[in-house]
Amino acid sequence: MRVERAREGDVKACVNLVCDAFAGTEDAKPRAYVLKYVVGLVVDGDCEETALVARRRARESETGGEGEGEMEDDAGANGEVVGFVTVSISAKTRPPERDRNMSPPDDAAYLANACVAESARREGIGRALVKSVEDLVLEMGGCDVWLHVRENEPAPLALYTGEGYERVSKEKSNVFEGMFGDKRASRIMMRKELRSDGSCNFML
């Protein structure tokens, strides 16, 4: 398995993965919305937001895991996409927050849309995606990573906590929320400092 920037040929797989992973959750989006978003990232290109994918080589996909497949030099230059994540470095690429306490700094790196195919979970892919985002942020001159996670999602919350992310704030519930049975789980904003030398200057 390897993590790399998404390619044009990955669009369909990425859309399928995101739609399946978030189906039935508070963060589900129409397929047309996801398609437009992924195409904008992968095909059109955006220097302020990037999509990464976790890719299984061909032998790994056949065997359902790593092992021998990882020893193949490049058995699948276009292996199966089993993970997806985005990272942005500008508030312009992110939807505005109603609660200002839930807004990451405008010029901070923001991790979002992390998901792993159901058939590939518990293989360390989520951790690999997070680590790849952090490596990319450092390479670009950033010093920290911010993200949001739902408080009713124990697996990703445990992953981020285990990787050193700390809670910054929690979303306030709307006074009218839940009156008609549509109560949403609150989000938690988290941050991880990648370096503490005071230098945080993205180079585009």
Regions found by a protein language model. Name each.
Residues 143-146, 150-157, 161-204:
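C-terminal "cap" of GNAT-fold acetyltransferases
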Residues 2-16:
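A short beta-loop-alpha structural element at the N-terminal edge
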Residues 12-22, 187:
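Hydrophobic alpha-helical core bundles mediating ligand binding, dimerization, or RNAP-core interactions
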Residues 103, 112-122, 149-150:
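A short, internal acetyl-CoA/4′-phosphopantetheine-binding micro-motif in the GNAT/acyltransferase core
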Residues 60-65, 69-113, 174-179:
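Conserved acyl-donor/pantetheine-binding loop and adjacent beta-alpha core of acyl/acetyltransferases
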